[in-house]
């Protein structure tokens, strides 16, 4: 990939270097489409076993020893109950985008990193060992029993 030369970069700055620069946009869906999609997503079925899996996953970020997963020394602050809600809704949206009317454990696993990474704070020990929230969440995903 080549970078623009100095003059081209100055043109880019002149065009884009202000906060009021509004890109041209075109409507791709209507408000009605969005509201209908939301309605469908809300109706997507989540089995009790999958709900329990979601709750266990989030609770594991707060009390991993209870689940036999060795990451407690690396978690300063686990995910809040809002993560449980976000993980459920995001898994439903994932199922919707795949044309299914039900959530699978794989839907949950597919979105877990995106939902949880900013909700799990790591300790200084974790940072010293070059571990971050993603590696900790991945260990939970790998070791937490899947229904």
Where are these regions (language model features)?
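C-terminal engagement/docking regions of AAA+ P-loop ATPases
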Residues: 63-147
């Amino acid at each position: 990939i080549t970078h623009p030369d100095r003059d081209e970069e100055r043109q880019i700055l002149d065009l884009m270097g202000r906060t009021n620069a509004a890109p041209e946009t075109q409507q791709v869906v209507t408000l009605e489409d969005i509201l209908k999609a939301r309605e469908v997503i809300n109706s997507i079925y989540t089995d009790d076993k999958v709900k329990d899996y979601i709750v266990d996953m989030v609770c594991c970020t707060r009390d991993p020893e209870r689940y036999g997963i060795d990451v407690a020394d690396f978690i300063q602050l686990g995910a809040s109950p809002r993560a449980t809600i976000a993980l459920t809704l995001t898994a439903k949206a994932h199922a919707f985008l795949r044309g299914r009317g039900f959530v699978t454990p794989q839907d949950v696993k597919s979105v877990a990193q995106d939902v949880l990474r900013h909700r799990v704070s790591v300790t200084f020990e974790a940072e010293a060992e070059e571990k971050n929230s993603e590696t900790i969440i991945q260990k939970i995903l790998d070791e937490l029993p899947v229904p």
